[in-house]
Amino acid sequence: MPQVTMRQMLEAGVHFGHQTRYWNPKMAPYIFGARGKIHIINLEKTVPLFNDAMNFLSSVAQKRGTVLFLGTKRSARESIKEEAERCNMPFMTQRWLGGTLTNFRTVKQSVARLKELEAAETDGTFDKLVKHEVLGLRREREKLDASLGGIKEMNRLPDAIFVIDIGHEDIAIKEAKKLGIPVIAVVDTNYDPALVDYAIPGNDDAIRAVQLYARAAADAVLEGKAAAPNSASVREEEFSADAADEGKGRRAPAKKGDKKADAAE
C-alpha cells in the first residue's frame, strides 16, 4: 500500500477545509477546529480513512478490476489524467456526460464512433474526401475524444470510481450508487461523507493535495496489479483443485482378501 505520511499531507495542504459558513455538520467528526474562518481538517482522522481507501483500490486491482478516475474540475484534470494513464486505468476529466454509467450501452456506441473516426483518419479514408467533409469529421472526432477519449478502452462498467470533489461530480456519484458501484472520494468540509463508500476527509481544491491523492491512488492500483496472480498460475491452481476433487470422488480399488470389500461383494 502506498505510504503517505501526515507530514506529506500537511505540506500538500490536505488539512485546509472550506470557509466555516459553508460547512456540512456531518463532517464535524473530522474537523479539528477553525483558523481565520477556515475549517481545519483533523489529519489524525484522515490518515486511517485514506489508508482504508487505498487498500480497497489495491484489492480491486488485484482482482483485475477496473477503477475509473474522475476529476472534471480545473484543479484536478491534469493530475487525474496523468495518474490514470500511469496505472493504465480509464479516466474522465471533462464534463461528466449524464448516463455514462446508467446508459453505458449508448456511450459504447459513441466510443465505437470515435474509434471509427480515428481509424478513418489514419488509414487514408480522409484523403478521399473533400476538405469541408474532413474538417467536419475532425471536429466530431475532437469533440468525442475530449469527452470520451479517457474511457474508450473501458469495455464494461467500472468496478470502482475514484473521485475528486463529490459536489462537482454529484451526477456521477448518483449513477454509481444506483448501479452499486463503490465510490472512493475526497470529501471536503462542505459535503456529506455518507454519500460515498470510502470517504477521505481532505482539501479537494489545492492542486498539490489533488496530486497527492491521485498519485497514491495510482500507486495503490499498480501494487494491486503486481500482486494479482498471472493467468498461468490461476490455471495451474484450478487444475490442481479439479484433480484433488476428482481424487476425492474416485474409490480406491480393493485389495484381495480385504474383508470389507469381500463383504460388500
Curated annotation (Swiss-Prot):
UniProt-listed Pfam families: Ribosomal_S2
Tagged with keyword Methyltransferase: no
A single BP term in Gene Ontology: translation
Regions of compositional bias (Basic and acidic residues) in chain numbering: 245-265
GO cellular component: a single term: cytosolic small ribosomal subunit
GO molecular function: structural constituent of ribosome
Entry keyword Cytoplasm: no
Region (Disordered): 226-265
Family assignment from sequence similarity: Belongs to the universal ribosomal protein uS2 family.
Lineage, uppermost ranks: Bacteria, Pseudomonadati, Pseudomonadota, Gammaproteobacteria, Lysobacterales
Protein's name according to its UniProt entry: Small ribosomal subunit protein uS2
InterPro entries: Ribosomal_uS2, Ribosomal_uS2_bac/mit/plastid, Ribosomal_uS2_CS, Ribosomal_uS2_flav_dom_sf
Cited Gene3D superfamilies: Glucose-6-phosphate isomerase like protein, domain 1, Helix hairpin bin
Classification via SUPFAM superfamilies: Ribosomal protein S2 (SSF52313)
Superkingdom in the source lineage: Bacteria
